[in-house]
């Protein structure tokens, strides 16, 4: 294995906006102590794409050091959900910035757009050096957290973004990507998505090669968005812990993007970690009754090693 995996953390979270208010009293005191010592990792944040689409990638149009929620959203969009004050208030120790591109972008266009997304992340971090710093390893996250800054990492949200090329995967790693979600909302040529008709019933031989190359590099295999068959195939193929950057338990919310209990048990055996998705925007009303229970459910077995 080329590099230590970033899954060496006790806490992994993926959130848009928290639904619950901060805890009070002894619980809050304990949380403050834990989060001062252990970096809370938000596994998925789509801010780079919002900056690209709304501001054409021009960071000068937003003041990330102030509350950005007052910026009017586009007619068919949502308000910005992230800024430095809210990262600090949420005690975020490390943030995976998603460099997602739409699944209808193919080939070299998908690769180029991914590179442009990576550029947005790095320029954002450079613009706020007192608060943000790029991280490429577990030790980087610990060091940056101790310096009271938010460690910034890059996650690729879809295997379509490497254009079926292990060489592109390697170069994305060299540019800072530390996880890749194997699919987004549609199948790739080598892996099935949770929200598309099954084609491969898991991974193709090339898909297994992708997992093995990610293992070799020290790049996290992210199983959010993939089908249960793909989850199981990737868990069988992976020689390192996997993650779910933004998925929840299907037993609580019966959504195709969430993780069945039998797979969660395999994740525990793998030593991997599952984040908790708190973004109400991706929940249809049909699925929302379980939301009040999510914050209080523990002991599911999956953990970060």
Task: Mark where each language-model region is.
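N-terminal hydrophobic targeting/anchoring segments and the immediately downstream early-domain regions
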Residues: 21-200, 254-305
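Histidine-centered catalytic micro-motifs
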Residues: 40-47, 226, 244-247
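Alpha-helix-loop-beta-strand connector modules within alpha/beta enzyme cores
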Residues: 199-217, 234-244
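Distinct, well-ordered alpha-helical segments
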Residues: 165-169, 230-240
């Amino acid at each position: 294995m080329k590099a230590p995996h970033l899954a060496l953390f006790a806490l992994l979270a993926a959130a848009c906006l928290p639904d619950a208010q901060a805890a009070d009293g002894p619980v809050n005191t304990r949380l403050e102590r834990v989060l001062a010592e252990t970096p809370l990792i938000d596994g998925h944040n789509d801010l780079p794409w919002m900056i690209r689409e709304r501001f054409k990638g021009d960071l000068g149009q937003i003041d990330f050091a102030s509350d950005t929620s007052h910026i009017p959203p586009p007619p068919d969009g949502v308000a910005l959900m992230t800024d430095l004050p809210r990262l600090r208030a949420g005690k975020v120790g490390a943030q995976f910035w998603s460099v997602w591109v739409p699944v209808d972008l193919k080939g070299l266009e998908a690769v180029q757009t991914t590179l442009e997304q990576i550029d947005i992340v790095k320029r954002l971090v450079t613009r706020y050096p007192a608060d943000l710093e790029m991280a490429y390893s577990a030790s980087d996250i610990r060091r940056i957290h101790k310096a009271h800054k938010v460690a910034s990492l890059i996650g690729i949200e879809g295997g379509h973004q490497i254009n079926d090329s292990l060489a592109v995967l390697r170069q994305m790693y060299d540019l800072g990507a530390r996880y890749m979600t194997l699919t987004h909302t549609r199948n790739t040529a080598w892996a099935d998505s949770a929200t598309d008709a099954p084609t491969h019933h898991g991974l193709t031989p090339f898909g297994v090669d992708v997992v093995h190359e990610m293992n070799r590099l020290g790049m996290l295999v992210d199983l959010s968005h993939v089908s249960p068959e793909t989850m199981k195939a990737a868990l069988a193929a992976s020689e390192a812990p996997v993650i779910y950057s933004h998925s929840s338990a299907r037993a609580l919310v019966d959504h195709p993007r969430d993780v069945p209990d039998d797979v969660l048990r395999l994740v525990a055996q793998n030593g991997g970690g599952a984040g908790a998705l708190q973004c109400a925007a991706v929940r249809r009303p049909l699925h929302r009754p379980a939301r009040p229970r999510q914050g209080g459910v523990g002991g599911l077995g999956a953990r970060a090693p």
